[in-house]
Amino acid sequence: MKIFDCFTYFNEDDLLRVRLETLAAHVDHFVIAEATHTQSGLPKPLNFRPALFEKFRDKIIYVAVDDMPVHLNDAWANENHQRRALMRGLSAAAFDDLVMVSDLDEIPHPARLNAYEPRFYRGTFIQRLFYYRFNNEALDPVTLAPQSWRGTQITTYHHLLDFFGDTQNLRIYKPTGLLRSAKRQWLKAFRNQDIADGGWHFSWVMTGERILTKINSMAHQEFNTDPIASIEAINRRLLEGHDILQRNIRFRRVALDSQFPEFIVVHRDEFKDLIL
């Protein structure tokens, strides 16, 4: 049985490095899908540089997505198409192989990969949620309890083909037909396994300049407004401990310890600009 770790990529080399170093000893292949257009439909270069990740060359299956439906002028259609393109990297998978689908910044805990039970159609890794910096944990604004994130999804290749159909539908199950709502509830209640202590969601962990680039290119164009989309505003809100996207979220700085990926802890000096 092999494990395929599948995710989309834009230009997040720091997070990609953390992900590869954290999971390389535990998965057989990384399937990386990168598109020639942003989610908002703008042309972009292919940013993945194999030379930076030469030590993982034998594990990486790279998919360049050059057929984005940008003519639809639909950011969500572009995002979904890029995620579906991960299927193109699974041609060598066998029915009993495991397939994980994530956003790049959702890193499953390597010690929890074997917690998934294939009698469930899907496993969902419940992950700790951090924003903007590796140790800037998101809190509920009312209770101040740490927020969790339903991130990485895992299934067998057989379930992926026979039940979900593709990697986008594994990520967000949207059946069709008159019974679609009942099917969603049935999956959630009886065929989805929540996997506790499931890793980390390092959302928007990048420099202010890259945050601005992401705002300009992402599907969530409601955030691309003048008060938010400037380097000055981004840096100011980071220093003040406020949410850059002006959402109702509180944060706390937590110690960088053994609860984090070992690679971040060991190389904290290299990541000093991404740590509080």
Q: Where is each model-derived feature located?
A:
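Short, well-formed alpha-helical segments that are part of the catalytic scaffolds
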Residues: 12-32, 39-48
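Short, structured coil segments at secondary-structure junctions
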Residues: 26, 56-58, 118-119
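Catalytic phosphate/metal-binding cores of nucleic-acid and nucleotide-processing enzymes, i.e., regions
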Residues: 4-6, 18, 84-96, 116-124
